[in-house]
Amino acid sequence: MEENNDKLATNSYVNLFINRHEHAPTYSIITHGCQMNEHDSEKIKTLLENMGFEKSDEKLDADFIIFNTCLVRENAEMKVYGQLGALKNLKRENPDMLIAVCGCMMQTGPARDIIREKYPQVDIVFGVNNINSLPYLIDRHLSSGKLVVDIERKDDIDEDITIKRDNEYVGYVNIMTGCNNFCTYCIVPYARGREQSRSVESILSEVKRMVDQGYKDITLLGQNVNSYGKTLENPVTFTELLTKVNDVEGLERLRFLTSHPKDISDELIEAMGKLDKVCENIHLPFQAGSNSVLERMHRRYTKESYLEKVEKLKKSVKGITFSTDIIVGFPGETEEDFQDTLDVVRKVGYEQAFTFKYNRRPGTKADLFEDQVDEDVKQDRLERLLDVAYPIFYEKNKSYLGTIQEVLIEGESKNNPEVMTGRTRTFKLVNVKCDKSYIGKLVNTKIVDFNSFALTGEMVD
């Protein structure tokens, strides 16, 4: 009954808005952070459109603006505050405008306090587990005229709504949320809570529904997918789930994100080599190459065990490609430690790397470490890391020259409407000159050019 009341209240708001302004209220969602946040934003989009909101063409010019925030990096946090500040005058000119802030930042008390004290233009604050309460929160704010906050944690994952995704052929399916690892630099377990897994039945139902809608490339999403199933009443391994999803008729490609190196089992590695829809690509963050740094990070694997798993993956999955996350300048990192990181980069031969200077996150254990590395040293190491990584990316892409690759055409190039972009099974970005009729299709493409970050192809029969 409560759900129906929420819908009635929110529809009343939309109807009132239409009567006042003679058009439906518009919305804009500004998303910071990881693929989990992107997926959450799609859920918010679905709720708003079901209420009667229409998407705005302008990010910072809409009747309802939602900021989906990230807490992992300080610069993402600062961007949100800057964008909120820019809306102060706009809100004064348009008092009917609604502003909401959600996501990982809002799971921490200090960030919520800053919003309360410095950004009175914000109307609604909600957490990562409270997205489905948005209709009710809108109504509460309109009734009270005051800031409404809902960050209460839930013990289950609510994934019942049919999500309206931004891409019609490539999509993400959330299989779990939270993390139990508590790496010393990471705020995620505090923001998203402990691991919770969706049921196999719920996941398979969503995958089948997406395939029926035309989706061809699906990524199973979680903070640490290799821990999937441990919290279920009848525990299931991630390998068992992957096998069941692989069997869904009509699905073309299957991926997963993200994996923790300590949890990748021999069973999973073997399955990746046998399951025909599982793509030859894995994102495997190693963060640092030094065992002493890894221990201080509480990663619970060593440089040697990481490289051993990489070799097993290379043997099991023909042509597999690797991407990773790397942090330089972690507290206590010496030049010798940094050289260990460069050694891993050279030995693995990554196709892509997300590289970061360590930045302190209040509330994490590493923030309390006394031996912080100077900023200029961090910057120097980041630049030297990229000097090693970029030539590897270049040589990896060069190896595709003249080969025929299966490419799923995903949409128009941002730079040239006559060029479409797509991905190979190994997650290589390919620019292909063809018309829009090929969007959503798998096409054989000959690679004729490249740079460090993308390939250029021509369609072949």
From Swiss-Prot:
Protein name, entry field: tRNA-2-methylthio-N(6)-dimethylallyladenosine synthase
Coarse class of the protein's main subcellular location: cytoplasm
Known function: Catalyzes the methylthiolation of N6-(dimethylallyl)adenosine (i(6)A), leading to the formation of 2-methylthio-N6-(dimethylallyl)adenosine (ms(2)i(6)A) at position 37 in tRNAs that read codons beginning with uridine.
Ranges for domain MTTase N-terminal: 25-143
Record's signal peptide: none
Keyword entries, A-Z: 4Fe-4S, Cytoplasm, Iron, Iron-sulfur, Metal-binding, S-adenosyl-L-methionine, Transferase, tRNA processing
Residues where [4Fe-4S] cluster 1 binds: C34, C70, C104
Protein localization: Cytoplasm
